[in-house]
Amino acid sequence: MVKIGVLGLQGAVREHVKSVEASGAEAVVVKRIEQLEEIDGLILPGGESTTMRRLIDKYDFMEPLRTFAKSGKPMFGTCAGMILLAKTLIGYDEAHIGAMDITVERNAFGRQKDSFEAALSIKGVGEDFVGVFIRAPYVVNVADDVEVLSTHGDRMVAVRQGPFLAASFHPELTDDHRVTAYFVEMVKEAKMKKVV
């Protein structure tokens, strides 16, 4: 069984754990740097990206997270997690982890009061997935090797680049675990490649 970490500094940690377990993988709440060595994949949950960055810096997680990304182990960022994975952020000079060659705009759908749900078609996942958007970012631009998995209107809301997956919405806030299951499969495939 693959072991998937959920960065436990802030955000919808419990909900991600539940979704990972429902998808047939072991879930670990990651609160210490050394735990990164014990997991096969990592979820960066939604939350408030500025607060999350402060906590990542406070607990010296940034370089270990970048090292984890460079190791090729899969990472999945939802909402604020997408912001952490992006190489370019509109209106900001520097990236956070910067593992994905995507440009992201924060709070692109508006503030909290403008939160909404939308039925999405997601490549590799299926139709009618209810995306919960809360002060959501979206992807403005992608490199050629980034696969766009889903759009809402003309905005890219789910993308994949090799071992990295990012979504504007919160898949963990529904009882539909298909997006998490997709990530679990990515982790299984990556682990199998390492064994071979």
UniProtKB/Swiss-Prot annotation:
Keyword tags: Glutamine amidotransferase, Hydrolase, Lyase, Pyridoxal phosphate
Keyword Lyase included in the entry's annotation: yes
InterPro entries named among the record's database cross-references: Class_I_gatase-like, PdxT/SNO, PdxT/SNO_CS
Active site: 79 (nucleophile), 170 (charge relay system), 172 (charge relay system)
E.C. designation(s): 4.3.3.6, 3.5.1.2
Signal sequence segment: none
General function of this protein: Catalyzes the hydrolysis of glutamine to glutamate and ammonia as part of the biosynthesis of pyridoxal 5'-phosphate. The resulting ammonia molecule is channeled to the active site of PdxS.
UniProt-listed NCBIfam families: PLP_synth_Pdx2 (TIGR03800)
Record's protein name: Pyridoxal 5'-phosphate synthase subunit PdxT
Lineage: Bacteria, Bacillati, Bacillota, Bacilli, Bacillales
Gene behind the chain: pdxT
